[in-house]
Every structure is written in C-alpha cells, then in structure tokens.
C-alpha cells in the first residue's frame, strides 16, 4: 500500500512527555514520559578476557533499553534513566534515535517505510538540529517523507476547532507551557517572529517542586522517595488559579473545612496508607506564574507583564491581532481560571498604557480600545499534537513534506526550511 494511503505518524516530543499517534485522530494514542533507561556500563578491567567480553556485549547492550513508563519503573534496576530532551531541545541524539525506535516499532507498531512523519520542533530550534532529525529519519528509519512543524503554529491551528470559520487566524500569541519550559511565541500569518520570542523559566516541573517545598516546610509525613510524585498528583488534582492571593488566604483562614482537601496515598515501601492535608498549596502552586518571586527570587516578572512587553516589541501592524488571539497550549495552562486571570491582567496593562497616552496628550488623543482575548479550548492539553494531526490529515501535507528522493538528491539541508501550508495562510 502506498504511503499516501496510510495515515501519517505524528510525534510531539516534549521535555516531560512525548505524544504520539496517527493523523486524523483527536487525541494521541500514546502519552509516555520522555525518558530512556540504558544499561549501566560494566566497570573497566585490565583482564583481556573481560575487555573482549565487554566488546562482544556492547552490541547487545545497545539494544537493551527501556523508554517511557518502563524506564521509570522500579523494576528497571541496573539501568540509568536519562532524558534526551532538556528545555524542549534535544541534547543527546544517540539516545533520541533509540527513543524514536521504540516509539515507532513498539508503540505505534508501524513500518516507518510505509508512513509519512510529522515531527514538532520548539521555537528557536537550530537548523543543525533539523538536519540531525532528517538524517535519523531518512537514513535510520528510511521514511518516505518528513515534515518538521513549529509547535506554536500547530497550537494556533488546534484552537480553530472551537471557533467559527471567520474567526480562524494564523496570527496570534501562543503561550506554550509544558513540564520543562514555557515559551511566549508571536506568530504572524503562520510565521514565527523569532526576534520577539520570550522564554519564561517557570513550567509544570517548577510548580511541582514549589508544592513539594511547601509540604516539606509543614513537615508532612510524606515518604521522602514519594514526595515529588505526591506533589505532582496534588498539583494535577487540586490546584487552581485564584483572582486575589490575599483574599484567598482569608477564605482558607475563615472556613478551612470548606476549602481544605485530603490526598490519600500508600507508602511504596511499607505499604501503609498515609494522607496529606492540602490547603494553601492549592492556589499558591499555579500562582508562581503571576508572582514568580514566590519560588525564584532571580526572576520576578509576571507572565502578564512578559506578554505585554513582548507584544509591544512586535511590528505595530500585528499587535492588535496578537492581543486578540492569545492561545493557551500545554498541560501547565490547564489550571482552572488560568485564562480568566491572564486575560484580566493583560487587559489591565494595555488599558493603563492607553490611558497614559491620552493623559500625556492632554486629551487630544483618543486611542481605540484594545480587545484582549485569551483562548482556552478543550484540545489545550494536547494542542500541539492535535494541530499536527489536523494538518497531517490534509492532502497538502504530502505536497509540502520533504521526500526521501529529495533527501538523497540534496542532503539533510532540505529540512532547514519547512514551508507553511498554503491552505492555512
């Protein structure tokens, strides 16, 4: 069967998790940790026989590894867990190739020669990294076609699912916050404005660490080896964004029984149950997006200020379009009322600037009000993957993808540039 007749494989590699599945589906078939467990190296020996055995076993050890949940399981003893992706960028290409190998053959159960592939890349990814990706995909896996899509553009596309046709736009500001990194990426007509991208050193993992430290300060009887996982479960199960921190403290102090929650767990070693009272952690965790000084004294700029400053640095003719289409993407933007508070704070900043302009002009200038819209939608958690699934299911995907024949003729440099879909612009 032709590769054009089979659905394309869509793989979104993130710092914490990898989403993979087939084009045309609304959700990824698999969501697995971006971790790989490799065999510990045997200690070196001066014995000639030992050196010979090590050389013979090296090839076998290369095949002896686990990825995803299996890599993190307690059963993976004598293995070292590594993360090939850091802050969204691939750092170890040998491990990444082995990771993709199991993604394709073990999870997707696909023959790579029979499917086109859509992979995602973070903002400001280097052209050299695209070339490395092309070399692995075309030479190691012999794929017939490859398209490397910018995550921000895919997230914008995913937001179309909840909007009318006349409201769909490829101009907008994407707030992509996953487990390891948060990026604010302005996009104009499908092209990323690279010089204006902002990086925020706060993401899901930082929230988990902050909640973990809050629980530790209260000297909770949480098993030390489970403290991180417990904090992570509390974050996902109980946390929300509050409109005013001080008023929220008063609410909890006035009627604690109404707002406190209890997390029940089991000690992984003694198998005895334990419970954790969850109070201020519910709203203080996500609040570090708006008050980063709570956990990081070196970074004190709220996310709303970062967004407003970023938009003001963009070309003047796209600024209103960016304010009107702030799209949320990634699991760390899923907290209840996150979109509402972000929209309120950004609106307050933009209105304050317009009012200052009018005041400084002595009332002669009457600026047109700016409409600030923060878009939250049901595909938000897997927005990047879902956007890739939408695009890879169109006929144009096969026209813009780089083929194996082009790669053999021109080399990996063809993947330095991946055209924007004409149907989207």
Curated annotation (Swiss-Prot):
Q: Per the UniProt entry, what is one GO biological process?
A: Arp2/3 complex-mediated actin nucleation
In terms of Pfam families, this protein maps to: Actin
Matches recorded under InterPro entries? Actin, Actin/actin-like_CS, ATPase_NBD
User: Where found in the cell?
Assistant: Cytoplasm, Cytoskeleton
PROSITE patterns, sorted: ACTINS_ACT_LIKE
> Mind telling me which SUPFAM superfamilies this protein's record contains?
Actin-like ATPase domain
GO MF annotation terms: actin binding; ATP binding
Q: What happens when the gene is disrupted?
A: RNAi-mediated knockdown suppresses the memory retention defects of the msi-1 os1 loss of function mutant.
List the GO terms this entry assigns under cellular component, sorted alphabetically: Arp2/3 protein complex; cell leading edge; cytoplasm
The record's subunit annotation is: Component of the Arp2/3 complex, at least composed of arx-1, arx-2, arx-4 and arx-6.
Summary of the function given for this chain in its UniProt record: Functions as ATP-binding component of the Arp2/3 complex which is involved in regulation of actin polymerization and together with an activating nucleation-promoting factor (NPF) mediates the formation of branched actin networks. Seems to contact the pointed end of the daughter actin filament. Plays a role in time-dependent memory loss and the retention of conditioned behavior over time.
State the name under which the record lists this protein.
Actin-related protein 3
Q: Which organism is it from?
A: Caenorhabditis elegans
């Amino acid at each position: 069967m032709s590769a054009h007749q089979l659905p394309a494989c869509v793989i979104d590699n993130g710092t914490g998790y990898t989403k993979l599945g087939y084009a045309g589906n609304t959700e990824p078939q698999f969501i697995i940790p971006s971790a790989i467990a490799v065999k510990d190296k045997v200690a070196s020996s001066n014995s000639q026989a030992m050196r010979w055995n090590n050389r013979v076993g090296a090839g076998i050890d290369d095949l002896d590894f686990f990825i995803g949940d299996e890599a993190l399981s307690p059963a993976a003893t004598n293995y070292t867990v590594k993360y090939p992706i850091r802050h969204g960028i691939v750092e170890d290409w040998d491990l990444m190739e082995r990771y993709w190998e199991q993604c394709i053959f073990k999870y997707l159960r696909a023959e790579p020669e029979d499917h086109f592939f859509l992979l995602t890349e973070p903002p400001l990814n280097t052209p050299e990294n695209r070339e490395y990706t092309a070399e692995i995909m075309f030479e190691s896996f012999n794929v017939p076609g490859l398209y490397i899509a910018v995550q921000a553009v895919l997230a914008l596309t995913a937001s179309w699912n909840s909007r009318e046709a006349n409201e769909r736009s490829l101009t907008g500001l994407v707030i992509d916050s996953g487990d390891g990194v948060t990026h604010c990426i302005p996009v104009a007509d499908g092209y990323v404005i690279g010089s204006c991208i902002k990086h925020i050193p706060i993401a899901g993992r930082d929230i988990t660490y902050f909640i973990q430290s809050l629980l530790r300060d209260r000297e909770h009887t949480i098993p030390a080896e489970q403290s991180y996982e417990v904090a992570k479960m509390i974050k996902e199960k109980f946390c929300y964004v509050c409109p005013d921190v001080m008023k929220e403290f008063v609410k909890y102090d006035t009627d604690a029984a109404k707002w406190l929650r209890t997390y029940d767990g089991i000690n992984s070693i003694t198998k005895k149950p334990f419970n954790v009272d969850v109070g201020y952690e519910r709203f203080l965790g996500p609040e570090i997006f708006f008050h980063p000084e709570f956990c990081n004294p070196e970074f004190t700029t709220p996310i709303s200020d970062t967004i407003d400053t970023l938009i003001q640095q963009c070309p003047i003719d796209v600024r209103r379009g960016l304010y009107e289409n702030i799209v949320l993407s990634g699991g760390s933007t899923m907290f209840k009322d996150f979109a509402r508070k972000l929209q309120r704070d950004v609106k307050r900043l933009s209105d304050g600037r317009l009012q200052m302009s009018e005041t400084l002009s002595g009332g002669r200038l009457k600026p047109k009000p700016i409409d600030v819209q923060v878009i939250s939608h049901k595909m938000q958690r897997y927005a990047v993957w879902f956007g890739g699934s939408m695009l890879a299911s169109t006929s144009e995907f096969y026209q813009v993808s780089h083929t194996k024949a082009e790669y053999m003729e021109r080399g990996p440099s063809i993947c330095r540039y991946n055209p924007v879909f004409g149907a989207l612009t």
